[in-house]
């Protein structure tokens, strides 16, 4: 039988977990380097760029700088996406699979 109280408690818990996850993402720092460390880009877990470091030797070589910057940005973007997917899977796994609140039977 459907249990609205259980569903409400589960949704409240899920909202708290999502808020906690968002706060942790703000604190998570992901970085990528290219050109053997000549260019470095750091983002937080929400994908906001928080730091870019460029070696002075690249400042007069615009084309190389552009290529290395694009590479580092793409790599850190991929890291952010991987982190988001991992966090979402952890969130999903932490929710449990008790279908009794919907009147169904759990798998297994």
Curated annotation (Swiss-Prot):
GO CC field: bacterial nucleoid; cytoplasm
UniProt GO MF annotations: DNA binding
Coiled-coil annotated spans: none
Family matches, as Pfam families: YbaB_DNA_bd
Protein family: Belongs to the YbaB/EbfC family.
Annotated compartments: Cytoplasm, Nucleoid
Main location: cytoplasm
GN (gene name): ybaB
Keywords: Cytoplasm, DNA-binding
Function: Binds to DNA and alters its conformation. May be involved in regulation of gene expression, nucleoid organization and DNA protection.
Subunit structure: Homodimer.
Record's keyword annotation contains DNA-binding: yes
Naturally occurring in which organism (per UniProt): Helicobacter hepaticus (strain ATCC 51449 / 3B1)
Entries under NCBIfam families matching the protein: DNA_YbaB_EbfC
Protein name in UniProt: Nucleoid-associated protein HH_0332
Signal peptide limits: none
């Amino acid at each position: 039988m459907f249990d609205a109280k259980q569903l409400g408690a589960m949704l409240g818990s899920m909202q708290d977990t999502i808020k906690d996850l968002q706060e942790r993402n703000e604190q998570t720092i992901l970085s990528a380097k290219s050109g053997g460390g000549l260019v470095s880009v750091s983002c937080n877990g929400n994908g906001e760029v928080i730091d870019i470091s460029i070696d002075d030797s690249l400042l007069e070589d615009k084309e190389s700088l552009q290529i290395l910057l694009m590479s580092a940005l793409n790599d850190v973007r991929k890291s952010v996406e991987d982190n988001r997917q991992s966090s979402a899977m952890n969130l999903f796994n932490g929710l449990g699979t008790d279908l009794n609140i919907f009147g169904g039977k759990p798998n297994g």
